[in-house]
């Protein structure tokens, strides 16, 4: 696997020198300063690429070229936003950048309720608490009909939890959910958030898939033409939330994508930390079935708790993800490609890491502190080395 590292640009507290010292050779980044929907110019792409290469690294993957909400709702100026997206892909290809990670999550990108969940060893992790999320949705957001998405027990627990929250607790929970986590291109006030949810009131799973199909049928032929590989990122968490449909959550969703536009440019990001939240997702089977279309991997683990919809981000080699079997399946896919004469490695990043050691004293992007990711990258690197030596050395 190609070892990569997500970098949020010149303002990232983790420098490119840090990235190189961590042992990564590739950078995963995006032009976050360009508004959603606008074309990424060749000039801006080359400017960022030069910064990365001057640090002795390569720009391996774009994560992400964000999709304008008008495309997802099939309203407003969506045709122009699609045309802009097509041009951005052409410009990236012209600059030699050919792997693009993206997602089709409506309104919210990835979300968590707790950004400083303290683990037994004193390090901090990200956590999604189903009951806290229910308390936010029913008692802070006050979304009409939200109760239908929860069990009677969860409704009672959420009311009890809300009753014990201070004003600061409520404000922090709201910020965590709607203000935008790293990589999310949109942040909202509560009123803005309600208005955006309202735009989806008539959009169910079938309709969102229909809108996604319009996007894919416009984008994938361009990607194919210019040699770009599109790698969709799964929903996080991988299930409907806030009354919003989610359509990249299961192996059935992956198959739907392939059936909708059967092109090798139409591929996947295997994010084990997102897909792995669901107990019914067999990660190894997903890799084996769709291996030729996996162009990027995020390798981290999560741990489901007593309420199976509550989870926290575990250490990379712990939790519910069998990292050994996952890495073995990815390495096997790389060797299959090599036998076909394809030498390209699959870019891998350790995704998130725990806030630990000296990073506990620093301001860091949630999930993206340096030391926790350094640890995760080293651990996954070791797993891969052992697998390569045990099964593929000649």
Curated annotation (Swiss-Prot):
Induction: By fructuronate. Its expression is subjected to catabolite repression by glucose. Belongs to the mannonate dehydratase family. The lineage of its organism: Bacteria, Pseudomonadati, Pseudomonadota, Gammaproteobacteria, Enterobacterales. This is Mannonate dehydratase. It is an enzyme of class 4 (lyase). It comes from Escherichia coli (strain K12). Pathway: Carbohydrate metabolism; pentose and glucuronate interconversion. Its EC number is 4.2.1.8. It comes from the Bacteria. Is inhibited by high concentrations of Fe(2+) (> 2 mM), and by EDTA or other iron chelators in vitro. InterPro entries: Man_deHydtase, Xyl_isomerase-like_sf. GO terms for molecular function: ferrous iron binding; manganese ion binding; mannonate dehydratase activity. Optimum pH is about 7.5. The activity at pH 6.5 and 8.6 is only about 20% of the maximal achievable activity at optimum pH. Its cofactor is Fe(2+); Mn(2+).
């Amino acid at each position: 696997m190609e070892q990569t590292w997500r970098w949020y640009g010149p303002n990232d507290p983790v420098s490119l020198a840090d990235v190189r010292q961590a042992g990564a050779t590739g950078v995963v980044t995006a032009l976050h300063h360009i508004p959603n929907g606008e074309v990424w110019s060749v000039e801006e792409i080359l400017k960022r690429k030069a910064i990365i290469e001057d640090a002795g690294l390569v720009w391996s993957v774009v994560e992400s070229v964000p999709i304008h909400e008008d495309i997802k709702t099939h309203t407003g100026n969506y045709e122009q936003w699609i045309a802009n997206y097509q041009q951005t892909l052409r410009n990236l290809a012209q600059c030699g950048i050919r792997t693009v990670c993206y997602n089709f999550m409506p309104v919210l990108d990835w979300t968590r309720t707790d950004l400083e969940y303290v683990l037994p060893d004193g390090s901090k992790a990200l956590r999604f608490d189903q009951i806290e999320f229910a308390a936010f949705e029913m008692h802070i957001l006050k979304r009409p009909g939200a109760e239908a998405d929860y069990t009677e027990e969860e409704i009672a627990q959420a009311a009890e939890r809300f009753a014990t929250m201070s004003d600061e607790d409520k404000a922090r929970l709201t910020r965590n959910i709607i203000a935008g986590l790293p990589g999310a291109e949109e942040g909202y006030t509560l009123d803005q958030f309600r208005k955006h949810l309202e735009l989806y009131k008539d959009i169910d799973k079938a309709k969102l898939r229909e809108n996604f199909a319009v996007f894919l049928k416009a984008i994938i032929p361009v990607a194919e033409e210019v040699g770009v590989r599109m790698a969709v990122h799964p929903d996080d968490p991988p299930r409907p939330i806030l009354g919003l449909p989610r359509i990249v959550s299961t192996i059935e969703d992956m198959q739907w994508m392939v059936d909708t536009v059967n092109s090798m440019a139409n591929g996947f990001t295997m994010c084990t930390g997102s897909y792995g939240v669901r107990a019914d997702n067999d990660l190894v089977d997903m890799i084996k079935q769709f291996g030729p279309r996996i162009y990027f991997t995020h390798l981290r683990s999560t741990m489901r708790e007593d309420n199976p919809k509550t989870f926290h981000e575990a250490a990379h080699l712990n939790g519910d993800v069998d990292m050994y079997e996952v890495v073995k399946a990815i390495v096997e896919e790389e060797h299959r490609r090599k036998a076909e004469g394809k030498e390209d490695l699959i870019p891998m990043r350790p995704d998130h890491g725990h806030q630990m050691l000296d990073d506990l004293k620093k301001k860091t992007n949630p999930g993206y502190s340096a030391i926790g990711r350094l640890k995760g990258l080293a651990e996954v690197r070791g797993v891969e080395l052992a697998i390569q030596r045990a099964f593929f050395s000649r």
